[in-house]
């Protein structure tokens, strides 16, 4: 049986990860630690001799810069890259910009955990004048305004991630291309839930670490055979 490998990576630690703030669609860069994580991920993929055909990121710089660093380590900076908003992090609505501990004080631990981890619960939405809306940006100028979120559940995130996966990424995998996708904790959780056919409760406790390659091995019909994190 022929095995096709796809690599999923959550971006390296961002500055707001470090500061313990809800980030969502806010375009913050990697921290120094995040750049180091991306470099290590690239070195690890080089050790296992990965050669990619296509790369995908969100339109947020923490994923773009992570992939740049990885490809530099692999000497594959020529790789065609698609940057798409559908792979963006979940939009955290009115939580964006808040320190997570302060949010817990305001809303309560159980409520915050439900908003963060459940499949269907949506955090409070923000309005078009909110400082941390994240969508009032030139990169989204060609997207219909009513398409852009102002607060999402994981389910709503999956509703944009999975159709893109099925339409654009799956055919590439089916044609035996090696793909690398650098995305976000929740966009990757959405893909993982879809590929592994997890029910809503099973996704609750799944956490995606920053900067560690997650390898999916598929058969010829794009059915997952196994998945694992790459290690030293």
From Swiss-Prot:
Name of the top EC class for this enzyme: isomerase
One Pfam match: His_Phos_1
Chain ranges passing through the membrane: none
PROSITE patterns reported for this sequence: PG_MUTASE (PS00175)
Site entry (Transition state stabilizer), positions: 184
Gene3D superfamilies: Phosphoglycerate mutase-like (3.40.50.1240)
EC number of this enzyme: 5.4.2.11
One biological process term in Gene Ontology: glycolytic process
Tree of life domain: Bacteria
Annotated keywords: Gluconeogenesis, Glycolysis, Isomerase
Reactions mediated catalytically: (2R)-2-phosphoglycerate = (2R)-3-phosphoglycerate
Active site: 11, 89
Annotated substrate binding sites: 10-17, 23-24, 62, 89-92, 100, 116-117, 185-186
Molecular-function GO terms, alphabetical: phosphoglycerate mutase activity
UniProt entry tagged with the keyword Lipoprotein: no
SUPFAM superfamilies assigned to the protein according to its UniProt record, in alphabetical order: Phosphoglycerate mutase-like (SSF53254)
Pathway: Carbohydrate degradation; glycolysis; pyruvate from D-glyceraldehyde 3-phosphate: step 3/5
SUBUNIT field: Homodimer.
PANTHER family per record: PHOSPHOGLYCERATE MUTASE
Family as reported in the entry's similarity comment: Belongs to the phosphoglycerate mutase family. BPG-dependent PGAM subfamily.
Job description of the protein: Catalyzes the interconversion of 2-phosphoglycerate and 3-phosphoglycerate.
Name of the protein: 2,3-bisphosphoglycerate-dependent phosphoglycerate mutase
Species name: Blochmanniella floridana
């Amino acid at each position: 049986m022929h095995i096709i490998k796809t690599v999923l990576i959550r971006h390296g630690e961002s500055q707001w990860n470090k500061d313990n703030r809800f980030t969502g669609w806010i375009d913050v860069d990697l921290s120094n630690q995040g750049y180091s994580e991306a470099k290590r991920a690239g070195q690890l993929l080089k050790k296992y001799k990965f050669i990619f055909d296509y790369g995908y990121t969100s339109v947020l710089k923490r994923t773009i810069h992570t992939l740049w660093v990885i490809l530099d380590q692999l000497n594959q900076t020529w790789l065609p890259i698609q940057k798409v908003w559908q792979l963006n992090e979940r939009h955290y609505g009115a939580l964006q910009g808040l320190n997570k501990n302060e949010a817990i004080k305001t809303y309560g631990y159980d409520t915050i955990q439900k908003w963060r981890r459940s499949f269907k619960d949506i955090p409070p939405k923000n309005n078009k004048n909110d400082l941390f809306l994240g969508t009032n940006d030139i990169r989204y100028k060609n997207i219909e305004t009513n398409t852009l979120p102002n607060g999402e559940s994981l389910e709503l995130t999956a509703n944009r991630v999975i159709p893109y996966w099925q339409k654009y990424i799956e055919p590439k995998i089916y044609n035996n291309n090696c793909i690398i996708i650098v995305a976000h904790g929740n966009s990757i959780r959405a893909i993982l839930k879809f590929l592994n056919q997890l029910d809503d409760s099973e996704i609750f406790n799944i956490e995606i670490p920053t900067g560690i390659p997650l390898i999916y091995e598929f058969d010829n019909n794009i059915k997952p055979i196994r998945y694992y994190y790459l290690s030293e």
